UniProtKB/Swiss-Prot annotation:
The lineage of its organism: Eukaryota, Fungi, Dikarya, Ascomycota, Pezizomycotina. It is an enzyme of class 2 (transferase). The chain crosses the membrane at residues 319-339. This is NDP-glycosyltransferase ltbB. One of its GO terms (molecular function) is glycosyltransferase activity. GO terms for cellular component: membrane. Pathway: Secondary metabolite biosynthesis. Keywords: Glycoprotein, Glycosyltransferase, Membrane, Transferase, Transmembrane, Transmembrane helix. NDP-glycosyltransferase; part of the gene cluster that mediates the biosynthesis of luteodienoside A, a glycosylated polyketide consisting of an unusual 1-O-beta-D-glucopyranosyl-myo-inositol (glucinol) ester of 3-hydroxy-2,2,4-trimethylocta-4,6-dienoic acid. LtbB likely serves as a glucinol synthase by transferring D-glucose to myo-inositol using NDP-glucose as a substrate. The ltbA carnitine O-acyltransferase (cAT) domain uses glucinol produced by the glycosyltransferase ltbB as an offloading substrate to release luteodienoside A from the HR-PKS. Glycans are attached at N36. It holds the Pfam family Glyco_tranf_2_3.
Length: 409
């Protein structure tokens, strides 16, 4: 009964070989000698509610990039909070900062309200807890737009870990898990893009998009009028936006290079669980919609075959996990040395646990004590997926106080 485990083992090796090949194949777009776009063409749009104290520092870094303007889209109950946080920057940058309010605390609706006030050729959609520490973010995210077929671009996202928390005695398991997850995610995106030009999600932490796309009323309607039952959807804003960009015939680009790296605040406690649940519910709903409704599995495979297959794999993770566990237990009973060899290979072999975690700890050595947490998260992931399927229609934001609204008759 070692045959099933052997087959799954061989499939795993093949999968890693394919990933390795496309990872080497990936190349970011270099800076053009004579760019058609500059910082003066960029309008930053920031939807925000329950705005954190770090917003002032994030704003300072965005303003340092010298964009055309920053449009902050909030709601009336949060406007005073935003005004308080940007006050230290008002005197020097009054002509570049605009605060607008939406009627609904819904990220998609707030974004479109911001779009209506922005004047740039390129919109930078930015989360309110994102830092642009490097001065090259804007030029490197603008570079792919030299190709007239590219509609949207995203770069690398990493964890923002303040100096006082870069300590093995201070950092929490939640922070270590979030940091590791971001590292793994950016690697998978470049592989998907190199394979077939596809991408699950251009993260809205920092996403550059042509203004004309979001200013199209049909696009805005499709983006803001998605419903679950009768309730307007709030979550999965960037996943849905990415799909709509593809649906309208645009290409995207991934700039996985240090020059395009931004960092983001990460949860220090159990709020990471709520964040993961929100992301996974939104992703699963969207992926299932792609496969079963529009554009449909066949068209998805024609458009982005590798990315679509990886999407199917992600949706089927509980089934894959059960298959591996069943095959390993059967092999343990009939040929234990093969079962133990498989575990050893998983731990120490090519791209196994130990090499992967060692590479991560080179950059984040202070996470060393907490590496049990990312490992645990990886292996309870299939169980979490089952819970996500059972609660897939739950669209609560969970970590912030978003509004809910039912569509009218």
């Amino acid at each position: 009964m070692a045959v099933p485990l052997g087959a799954l083992w061989a499939w795993s090796v093949l999968d890693k070989a394919v990933i390795s090949y496309y990872s080497r194949k990936y190349k970011p777009v270099p800076l053009p000698e004579r760019p058609n776009y500059s910082h003066k063409d960029v309008s930053i749009i920031v939807p925000t509610i329950d705005t954190e104290d770090t917003f002032t520092e994030c704003m300072r870094l965005w303003l340092k990039a010298n964009p055309r303007e920053i449009v902050i889209a909030t709601v009336e109950r949060n406007k005073a909070r935003v005004e308080q946080l940007i006050e230290p920057l008002r005197q020097q940058h009054a002509d570049k900062i605009m605060v607008v309010t939406a009627a609904l605390a819904n990220k998609r609706h707030q974004l479109i309200v911001g779009v209506k006030s922005a004047r740039g050729k390129i919109f930078a959609l930015v989360d309110d807890d994102v830092y642009w520490h490097v001065d090259s973010v804007v030029p490197y995210l603008l570079a792919p737009f030299e190709d007239a077929e590219v509609g949207a671009v995203a770069g690398i996202q990493s964890a923002e870990v303040p100096p006082e928390r870069q300590d093995v005695r201070v950092i929490t398991p939640w922070e270590a898990t979030a940091t590791f997850d971001l590292c793994q995610w950016k690697g998978s995106r470049e592989v998907h893009f190199a394979a077939d030009g596809g991408c699950w999600c251009l993260s809205a932490r920092t996403l550059f998009i042509r203004a004309s796309i979001l200013q199209d009323q049909s696009f805005a309607n499709a983006y803001t009028q998605e419903v679950i039952g009768r309730r307007l959807v709030n979550t999965a804003d960037d996943v849905v936006l990415t799909g709509l960009v593809f649906d309208r015939g645009w290409k995207v680009s991934i700039q996985n290079t240090p020059e395009a790296e931004v960092t983001t605040n990460i949860p220090r406690d159990h709020r990471l669980v709520w964040q993961v649940l929100r992301w996974d519910r939104g992703n699963f709903r969207t992926f299932l919609g792609y496969m079963l409704v529009s554009p449909g599995y066949r068209k998805m495979m024609q458009r982005h075959p590798y990315t679509t297959w990886k999407m199917v794999e992600r949706l089927a993770r509980p089934i894959w996990a059960f298959a591996y566990v069943w095959a390993w237990l059967q092999t343990l009973y009939t040929a234990p040395w093969i079962a133990y060899a498989y575990i050893a290979w998983m731990a120490f072999g090519w791209k196994g646990w130990l090499p992967t975690y060692r590479e991560f700890l080179k950059r984040y050595p202070y996470c060393g004590r907490q590496m049990w947490a990312p490992l645990l998260m990886d292996y309870i992931g299939p169980i979490v997926d089952i819970y996500v399927y059972l609660t897939i229609n739950n669209d609560d934001w969970l970590t912030r106080r978003a509004d809910t609204k039912d569509i009218e008759d």
